């Protein structure tokens, strides 16, 4: 059972359902851990997860996982679904008979948070379904201080779930036996039909929103009535007494036993920071980051075999003629050993990993074809519209390749893939944005889980984000993946942020992600115009040996006077202008990995270019964006010189809305860095 819930009742669930020792909870209240033993930053007790193997009445052992989550209500919903789907895929459980996602919601959040609808919409989609989710709504008839009339425009908080046409049960929260009956009915429905089911437990919050809150300020009449009501354990005890099921002495004995247990557990507490407990399938994965280069080349003979398999349409399959021609050109470049473009290198990286037994899951909006019509991982018959997936036809023994066009969602879809990555550390799990600009629709998932999950909860992830990035005159919402925001989230090695400039570098980067002994999220600024740029190609030899290089240096032919450091596609414009002007005094350095900052590589380079009088950082993003503010202090400390900024001036918008203005600004940047057009 994969369980997600907010903070209310969380400690109760941990100790009474997942059987977490009371003594561990007492230690969390005392905050008495040795600071020297603390790993990462930690989190408050109401956010931490837990998992255990619980033996139920019939002797069956059920693994129960309560996911760690942030205070942002409902944000954990798609994470639960993703982890559940990963476990189902690993267990060969497509109908969800062995793995059950269970979500506990609040009434105000279920009606109000948009991510709920995004998660519900995944329920029956091929790439996301988990055999149905059981939703339990703790309906306290209030959201902090907000009454239902101000919290939703529908009669019931559950009405958003009507989109799925599934059962919604409303049950009285003071009737435990009725609630149990409904839960059994809900689970039977889910098991038989493989769909979601919703249980609305109509109850109340006895105290305020938190330990120090006073509800009488805003709901005096409601809380007068609540405080007149006996607690539910008293009501249920009285019902059992009335039916002569138990005696008063037995009830008192139970109460005494609970209090004695709590006292004993409090006395026995030993507040030692708990050791990491990983989910299944994490054996052999290291937590420590290393900048040691990982050999990721693939022998030419094997790449040729793989290229023929992924670029050959089977007999009898009527593929679109333009696609057949495209695949033919891809194969031709591999056979010639030169001119391998971005999509071709990606396909070869995927094929090589799959043939080595490493599964791949690739999702995103329009990702099968690719936003820029570059990938074509799924071919569609012109006669029957049946699909053929070349990367699933590599031969016996290959790993599973899953490519799905996602629903039109960023936050929910990215949260799902983050959850999936928690359950499949040995695979390459990728989420691609349609344009990198749209990643801010999922900013909560990036901030709360991807960037900080390991620090807060010791939950590493190897998720890869592919974010098309680069100014090309397409306006402010089709230009920037907000590189600067990812860099602001970087603290040491929590995120790998890369901006590769060649297909070979991308090839090695993808392979490195699953070949290195640890797992860290990888954020890749991917290209748009470079997908078809005549200079953005690699040779077969570039793929057959070597590794991903965090820094690429291209020195001039003469004495170096100025060093231009940049990252991303602008390097090709700088190279072209340098050639046009025969500016042999310029050295060009490409920062392919921005974080963790490649200090060693740049130190060595600075030593070789010690004669340079000037070091410049060149970027096409505005001065308050891009990598400038992250790179400036680090680069200056290495070269022991002032680093000059060359780029657009600061701007509220990431790019101009008019193509002509873009061209004028871009030319000004290139001219300042290298010189005006000859």
Predicted regions: what they are:
Residues 130-247, 459-460, 471-484, 516, ...:
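Thiamine diphosphate
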Residues 1-115, 120-153, 159, 164-169, ...:
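Conserved internal helical-beta-strand scaffold that buttresses enzyme catalytic cores
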């Amino acid at each position: 059972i994969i369980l997600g819930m907010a903070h209310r009742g969380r400690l109760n669930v941990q100790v009474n359902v997942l059987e977490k020792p009371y003594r561990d909870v007492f230690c969390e209240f005392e905050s008495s851990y040795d600071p020297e033993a603390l790993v990462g930053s930690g989190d408050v007790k109401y956010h931490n997860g837990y998992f255990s193997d619980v033996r139920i009445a019939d002797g069956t052992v059920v693994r129960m996982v309560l996911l760690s989550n942030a205070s942002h209500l409902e944000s954990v919903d798609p994470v639960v679904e993703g982890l559940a789907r990963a476990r189902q895929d690993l267990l060969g459980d497509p109908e969800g008979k062995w793995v059950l996602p269970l979500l506990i919601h609040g009434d105000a959040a279920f009606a109000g948070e948009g991510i709920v609808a995004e998660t519900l919409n995944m329920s029956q989609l091929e790439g996301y379904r988990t055999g149905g989710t059981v939703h339990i709504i703790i309906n306290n008839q209030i959201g902090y201080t907000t009454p239902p009339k101000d919290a939703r425009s529908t009669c019931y908080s559950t009405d958003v779930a009507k989109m799925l046409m599934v059962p919604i049960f409303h049950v009285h929260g003071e009737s435990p036996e009725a609630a149990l009956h409904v839960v059994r009915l809900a689970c039977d429905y889910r098991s038989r039909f493989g769909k979601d089911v919703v249980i609305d437990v109509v109850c109340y919050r006895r105290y305020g929103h938190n330990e120090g809150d006073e509800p009488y300020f805003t709901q005096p009449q409601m809380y007068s009535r609540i405080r007149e009501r006996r607690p539910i354990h008293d009501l249920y005890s009285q019902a059992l007494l009335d039916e002569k099921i138990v005696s008063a002495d037995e009830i008192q004995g139970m109460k005494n036993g609970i209090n004695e247990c709590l006292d004993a557990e409090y006395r026995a507490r030993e507040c030692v920071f708990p050791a990491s407990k990983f989910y299944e399938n994490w054996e052999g994965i290291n937590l420590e980051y290393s900048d040691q280069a990982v050999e990721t080349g693939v022998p030419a003979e094997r790449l040729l075999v793989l290229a023929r398999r992924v670029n050959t349409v089977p007999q009898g399959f009527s593929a679109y003629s333009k696609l057949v021609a495209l695949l033919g050109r891809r194969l031709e470049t591999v056979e010639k050993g030169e001119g391998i473009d971005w999509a071709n290198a990606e396909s070869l990286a995927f094929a090589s990993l799959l043939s080595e037994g490493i599964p791949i899951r690739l999702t995103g909006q329009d990702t099968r074809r690719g936003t820029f019509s570059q990938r074509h991982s799924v071919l569609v018959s012109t006669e029957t519209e049946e699909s053929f997936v070349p990367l699933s036809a590599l031969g016996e023994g290959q790993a599973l390749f899953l490519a799905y066009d996602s629903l039109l969602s960023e936050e929910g879809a990215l949260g799902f893939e983050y959850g999936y990555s928690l359950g499949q550390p040995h695979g390459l799990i990728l989420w691609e944005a349609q344009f990198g600009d749209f990643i801010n629709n999922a900013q909560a998932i990036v901030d709360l889980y991807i960037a900080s999950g390991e620090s807060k909860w010791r939950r590493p992830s190897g998720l890869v984000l592919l974010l098309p990035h680069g100014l090309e005159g397409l306006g402010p919402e089709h230009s920037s993946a907000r590189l600067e925001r990812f860099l602001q989230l970087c603290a040491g090695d929590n995120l790998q942020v890369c901006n590769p400039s060649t297909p070979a570098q991308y090839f090695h980067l993808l392979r490195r992600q699953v070949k290195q002994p640890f797992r860290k999220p990888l954020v890749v600024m991917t290209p748009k115009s470079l997908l078809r740029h005549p200079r953005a190609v690699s040779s077969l030899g570039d793929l057959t040996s070597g590794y991903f290089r965090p820094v690429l240096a291209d020195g001039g032919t003469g004495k170096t006077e100025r060093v231009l450091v940049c990252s991303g596609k602008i390097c090709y414009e700088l190279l072209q202008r340098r050639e046009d002007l025969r500016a042999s005094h310029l050295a060009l350095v490409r920062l392919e990995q921005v974080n963790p900052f490649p200090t060693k590589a740049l130190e060595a380079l600075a030593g070789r270019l010690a004669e340079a009088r000037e070091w410049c950082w060149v970027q096409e993003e505005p001065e308050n964006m891009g990598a400038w503010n992250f790179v400036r202090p680090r680069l200056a400390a290495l070269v022991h010189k002032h680093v000059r900024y060359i780029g657009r001036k600061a701007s509220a918008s990431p790019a101009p809305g008019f193509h002509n203005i873009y061209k004028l600004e871009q030319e000004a940047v290139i001219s300042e860095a290298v010189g005006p057009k000859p």
